[in-house]
From Swiss-Prot:
Primary site of residence: secreted
Glycosylation sites: N34, N72, N100, N164, N223
Subcellular location: Secreted; Cell membrane
Note on how the cofactor is bound: Binds 2 Zn(2+) ions per subunit.
Taxonomic lineage: Eukaryota, Metazoa, Chordata, Craniata, Vertebrata
Gene: Smpdl3b
Subunit note: Interacts with TLR4, TLR7, TLR8 and TLR9.
Name of the protein in question: Acid sphingomyelinase-like phosphodiesterase 3b
GO molecular function, one term: zinc ion binding
Gene3D superfamilies on file: 3.60.21.10
Residues bound to Zn(2+) 2: D93, N134, H236, H277
Superkingdom field: Eukaryota
Disruption-associated phenotype: Mice display higher inflammatory responses in models of TLR-dependent peritonitis. Macrophages show enhanced responsiveness to TLR stimulation and a significant change in membrane fluidity and the global cellular lipid composition.
Organism: Mus musculus (Mouse)
Length: 456
């Protein structure tokens, strides 16, 4: 595969220095192996369900999951933009949105293997930290808290990326921890199986600590603190709430609370959290009990353009996105991120995939870096400045949806970004819905630990 005829617009890197490194984060590739440009709108892609796909193109459609051509182009665009990243984060969801009976265990494993082989082909010498998504199992979502065939088979597929200890851990529960590459050896990546906490997972309902992952995570973070390491935490299903509707949480509440406790206790060694699942571009702030910002989670957009069927979400498609982070190799401090995207409509018309820069975080939100304090400032601006809110809203769908983010939209996004806990999220929805007055959102953002009912 070559890039002949491709138009990829490269961005100048904003930070210079010997300690600056870069890494890719990709998520939610969702390959639909049966995608075809058919004259019959009901035969284009199984992932569209019963919806007719009227204008399918070679690079995909907003009603469908990714054709192979789209995923292939995304990986080769990554190689063209930054061929030698320090490492790659890959946070899962590889299979299409189709019923369980349309897949099966063998098909799930075949898709994971196909995408694994593509990444190895394009980046043969790059370390990859990979997590399973809720669609990377059969039946989907039903991840067990103990060893099983899929964990064992995926561990074999990912064996070149795993140490002996990680290989054994993955087979037990699909989570592991690895040192970061490079001479400093001052950091590590923790890969979580948060599918164990998913509210749709009946296998772990009623368990206090599925697979003892929380206990293990606490031990890893405590050891990192003792050893002077900083940590990146990655996974697929994030805690908190979906920002494109109201009251849609992913974790069971008890697991959500436990995750928050871990972050609050160990936030000083966590240099960043990186998740997917939403297909959208957003972030989540974490605060201590005094209201001080202590950590941030980045939600990377998906490669799949698939329009979600989640109740309450209006026109929930997105353009395909890929993301690169700039970081300090010595401290793991995040300096910036750049999101690249494919305008799918344009690509299908031109029959050429033009991956281009969508935005650079420091420029978009007028902040010095991608640190916790900077992301808190970004949230403040999103909450209080309409033009920044609108800019964020367009980026949230990877420049697919250019409609105006009105009051109800603002409530959904600000409360979801600011409040990962169930109780404070509910309070935020109530307060913002009842009291949308100038300055009120800014007060809420600057004082996140306050209960809205106390400031009314």
């Amino acid at each position: 595969m070559t890039l002949l005829g491709w138009l990829i617009f490269l961005a100048p890197w904003g930070v210079a220095g010997a300690q600056l490194g870069r890494f890719w984060h990709i998520s939610d590739l969702h390959l639909d192996p049966n995608y075809t440009v058919s004259k019959d709108p009901l035969q284009v892609c199984p992932s569209a369900g019963s919806q007719p796909v009227l204008n399918a193109g070679p690079w995909g459609d907003y009603l469908c999951d990714s054709p192979w051509a789209l995923i292939n182009s995304s990986l080769y665009a990554m190689k063209e933009i930054e061929p030698k990243p320090d490492f790659i984060l890959w946070t899962g969801d590889d299979t299409p949105h189709v019923p369980n009976e349309s897949l099966g265990e063998a098909a799930v494993l075949a898709i994971v293997e196909r995408l694994t082989n593509l990444i190895k082909e394009v980046f043969p010498d790059t370390k990859v930290y990979a997590a399973l998504g809720n669609h990377d199992f059969h039946p989907k979502n039903q991840f067990p808290a103990q060893s099983n065939r899929i964990y064992n088979q995926v561990a074999e597929l990912w064996r070149p990326w795993l140490s002996n200890e990680s290989y054994a851990l993955f087979k037990r529960g699909a989570f592991y921890s690895e040192k970061l590459p490079g001479p400093s050896r001052a950091g590590r990546v923790v890969v979580l199986n948060t599918n164990l906490y998913y509210s749709n997972n009946e296998q772990t309902a009623g368990m206090a600590d599925p697979g003892e992952q929380f206990r293990w995570l606490g031990d890893v973070l405590s050891n990192a603190s003792r050893d002077g390491e900083m940590v990146y935490v990655i996974g697929h299903v994030p805690p908190g709430f979906f920002e494109k509707t109201q009251n849609k949480a992913w974790f069971r509440e008890s697991f959500n609370e436990e995750y928050l406790k871990v972050i609050q206790k160990h936030h000083r060694v966590i240099a960043g959290q990186f998740f997917g699942h939403h297909h959208t571009d957003s972030f989540r702030m974490f605060y201590d009990n005094t209201g001080a910002p202590i950590n941030v989670m980045f939600l990377t957009p998906g490669v799949t353009p698939w329009k979600t069927t989640l109740p309450g979400v209006v026109d929930g498609a997105n353009n395909p996105g890929i993301r690169i982070f700039e970081y300090d190799r010595a401290t793991l401090n995040l300096k910036d991120l750049v999101t690249y995207f494919l305008n799918l409509r344009q690509a299908n018309v031109q029959e050429t995939p033009r991956w281009e820069q969508e935005y650079r975080l420091t420029e978009a939100y007028q902040v010095p870096d991608a640190s916790v304090s900077s992301m808190h400032t970004a949230l403040t601006r999103i909450a209080s400045e309409p033009h920044i809110l609108q800019r964020y809203y367009v980026y949230n769908s990877v420049s697919y949806n250019h409609l105006t983010c009105e009051d109800s939209c603002r409530i959904e996004h600000v409360c979801a970004i600011q409040h990962v806990a169930f109780n404070t999220y509910a309070t935020c929805l109530h307060g913002l819905g009842a009291k949308l007055v100038p300055g009120f959102l800014l007060i809420l953002t600057l004082l996140p630990s306050l209960h809205v009912l106390e400031v009314l």
